[in-house]
Amino acid sequence: MLQATGVILAGGRSRRMGQEKALLEVGREAMIRRVAGVLKEVFAEVIISGGVEENGLRLGLRVVPDLIAGGGPLSGIHAALCGAAFAKCLVVACDMPFICPELARYMMEQSEGYDVAVPRHGQHLQPLFAVYSKGCIRAIEESLRAHKCKVIDFYPLVRVNYVSEENLRALADIEVAFFNVNTPSDLVKARVMAENSRTGRVWLV
């Protein structure tokens, strides 16, 4: 069990989905419950950032509200870092139903000596499956005050390890692990992916 905090980011408005995503079921289980189950395998503390209090009650987890409103996911990361019991947090979006413990542990290892460890995935980064330390708090606050609300906007102000895609692929099928559910068609695809897995969870062990 890692002495760190797993954070489920659940405060999004889900405009493209048209309803709250956290409670939508994939593999006969709410997405937020799937994510929580994986994080509980790895982290000594698991919390929810944003979203409704009922989600925390269902899962027996503490919900931390935004302290600086209007910054989207960056506000959620800030609230989580301020409220976490440990110095480092792995932040995971609630709409990533196929994350795996192996990647979570590896990302924590890759955060040693850095304020942020973020995966590369193709031409993009995965800032909502990334490790952030409490050393980021001031930089995030500075970014939010300047209305720079993309998660990666504060990265130039801190020490960042951009984790190679090749190393991640050695641990898991990252096309599956990083699949996120934004639209109704994504939800259909995720349910098919889960159904095609005997365990209801699609990852490489």
Curated annotation (Swiss-Prot):
GO cellular component: cytoplasm
Highest taxon in the source lineage: Bacteria
Pfam families reported in the protein's UniProt record: NTP_transf_3 (PF12804)
Coiled coil: none
GO MF annotations, alphabetized: GTP binding; metal ion binding; molybdenum cofactor guanylyltransferase activity
Keyword Nucleotide-binding on entry: yes
Reaction equations catalysed: Mo-molybdopterin + GTP + H(+) = Mo-molybdopterin guanine dinucleotide + diphosphate
Compartments in which it is found: Cytoplasm
Domain notes: The N-terminal domain determines nucleotide recognition and specific binding, while the C-terminal domain determines the specific binding to the target protein.
Its job: Transfers a GMP moiety from GTP to Mo-molybdopterin (Mo-MPT) cofactor (Moco or molybdenum cofactor) to form Mo-molybdopterin guanine dinucleotide (Mo-MGD) cofactor.
Family: Belongs to the MobA family.
Name listed for the protein in its UniProt record: Probable molybdenum cofactor guanylyltransferase
